[in-house]
């Protein structure tokens, strides 16, 4: 980790949480999760607090490791991680038929990496919906630097209660974000409401697959690790997600777990048995260096108390993701394209 990289990471740790409150925020966040004895009901009923704490605590680590787009991707042999991430975003825009001048909504947009890429790729106007103040502040600055403030903006709101009029958007997408929703039907109904009739919604969902066995202790541990390290109330099955879209009123055009035929495993950047210079910060060695540096920064007071514990639960998530991917019980890219009927 370079000195500038270390300082950039340290300066953002904790997001909008004050430096003195980071440790207690970590305590509260961890207690929500099954890995520490927390209950699914508490995670769902307190999802706004849980998810906001998660992204305040984790965003700087994400940006340091992933760049501006916090998601996995279907990947071809010979393709870099960055190239695959961009193509994964372009695929959504193409499936939605996004064209110049269209109004598009990115649900759960993070710091806006995908919305900036899709806006530049399609020449559409993209609004990012996010309920985390720190991520929106960071995203607006990145929009300014990229010169896209005229076509890309952010709205701070809960995707379960969107502040938009009915039939506002020409297209809506979500990239590994609606997995945070406590109720998928309620979330998809809001998306349905703000989408214009005859237009489409495309999504990459985090899901457990048909290979997941709920009574298998190893499978349950992996699921708990992923939920802990990624701020999730519960990981739903692919069937549950697709049925939720139908229950919200959508017509299904097509669906597929894109991880099934990805020539390069989606979890490769996190796999301790592999090494890649192109994604070094995500590798086991890279993460170990980051963890050591965060510990040192915390020790000398440049990073808030509790930062090392955030690094630790993100490391636990990485282990769960790799194991879940190898056992084929988890996918971060269950894709479906659905349409709002022209006449309801």
From Swiss-Prot:
EC code(s) of this entry: 2.1.1.41
One term of GO molecular function: sterol 24-C-methyltransferase activity
Gene3D superfamilies noted in UniProt: Vaccinia Virus protein VP39
Pathway: Steroid biosynthesis; sterol biosynthesis
Lipoprotein found in the keyword field: no
Keyword annotations: Lipid biosynthesis, Lipid metabolism, Methyltransferase, S-adenosyl-L-methionine, Steroid biosynthesis, Steroid metabolism, Sterol biosynthesis, Sterol metabolism, Transferase
Leading EC class: transferase
Highest taxon of the lineage: Eukaryota
UniProt xrefs under Pfam families: Methyltransf_11 (PF08241), Sterol_MT_C (PF08498)
SUPFAM superfamilies: S-adenosyl-L-methionine-dependent methyltransferases
One Gene Ontology term from the biological process aspect of the record: sterol biosynthetic process
Reaction equations catalysed: zymosterol + S-adenosyl-L-methionine = fecosterol + S-adenosyl-L-homocysteine + H(+)
A single cellular component GO annotation: endoplasmic reticulum
Similarity-based family: Belongs to the class I-like SAM-binding methyltransferase superfamily. Erg6/SMT family.
Protein name: Cycloartenol-C-24-methyltransferase 1
Source organism of this protein record: Oryza sativa subsp. japonica
